[in-house]
């Protein structure tokens, strides 16, 4: 565990699309630190079987967006961290934290130093003695964002986070904006699904017409 001095230009719900026809990603939290390292943090509530490959896709999209045309060396590619926070143990070993870096199968101690790290944080880990107490408290707080959970911790950082959360919740204006943003995203997804279904029906209809014309 180390301190991460972040720059000011960080954001939430940052959308990234590398190519016009490629699938975009919407990052929950995107941050850059003073050492120019990239952090993308995602909260995943539902257990899905594609989270590992989803983390791979997010990392590849970020990497592609970082290296501009004409840059002479791949060594200028920034280190990046994909952090997935889940209220379940995706891997089943009881750990609060699983850190993945590319390693050599033939030489387990040989790590490919490519600067790409993926971390999965499990709020329901069972090995508190192997990680910091602050991380355990933070993960518990993220799952149960309550006054009671915030009062349990000695971490001033977590208490500051809770104070900020309380201010956001108590602000009617921010609350309304949050709900509006949530509703907009919900309807955008629904419209996208409906457009997809409509296009699918159109294609089916075209196929039927083509087949009938071919018979005639």
Predicted regions and their residues:
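A short, ordered amphipathic alpha-helix with a cationic face
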Residues: 125-129, 209-212
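Accessory alpha/beta interaction modules
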Residues: 1-117, 127-129, 191
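A near-ubiquitous, low-amplitude feature marking generic local secondary-structure context
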Residues: 12, 24, 38, 66, ...
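Short, charged alpha-helical interaction segments and adjacent helix-coil junctions
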Residues: 32, 39-44, 134-216
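Upstream accessory/linker segments immediately N-terminal to the RecA-like ATPase cores of bacterial MutS
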Residues: 106, 114-127, 133-145, 152-153
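Pocket-edge structural micro-motifs
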Residues: 84-87, 122-123, 169
């Amino acid at each position: 565990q180390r301190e991460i001095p972040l720059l000011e230009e960080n954001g939430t719900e940052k959308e990234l699309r590398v190519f016009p026809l490629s699938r975009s990603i919407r990052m929950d939290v995107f941050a850059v630190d003073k050492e120019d390292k990239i952090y993308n943090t995602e909260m995943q509530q539902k257990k899905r079987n594609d989270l590992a490959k989803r983390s791979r896709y997010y990392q590849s999209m970020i990497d592609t967006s970082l290296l501009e045309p004409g840059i002479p060396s791949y060594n200028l590619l920034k280190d990046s961290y994909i952090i997935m926070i889940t209220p379940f143990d995706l891997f089943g070993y009881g750990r609060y934290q699983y850190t993945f870096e590319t390693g050599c199968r033939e030489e387990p101690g040989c790590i490919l130093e490519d600067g790409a790290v993926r971390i999965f944080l499990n709020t329901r880990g069972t090995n508190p003695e192997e990680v910091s107490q602050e991380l355990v408290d933070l993960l518990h707080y993220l799952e149960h964002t309550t006054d009671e959970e915030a009062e349990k911790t000695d971490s001033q950082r977590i208490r500051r986070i809770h104070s900020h959360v309380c201010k956001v919740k108590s602000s009617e204006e921010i609350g309304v904006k949050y709900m509006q943003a949530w509703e907009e995203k919900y309807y955008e997804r629904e419209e996208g699904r409906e457009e997809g279904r409509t296009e699918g029906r159109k294609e089916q209809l075209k196929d039927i017409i083509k087949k009938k014309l071919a018979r005639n």
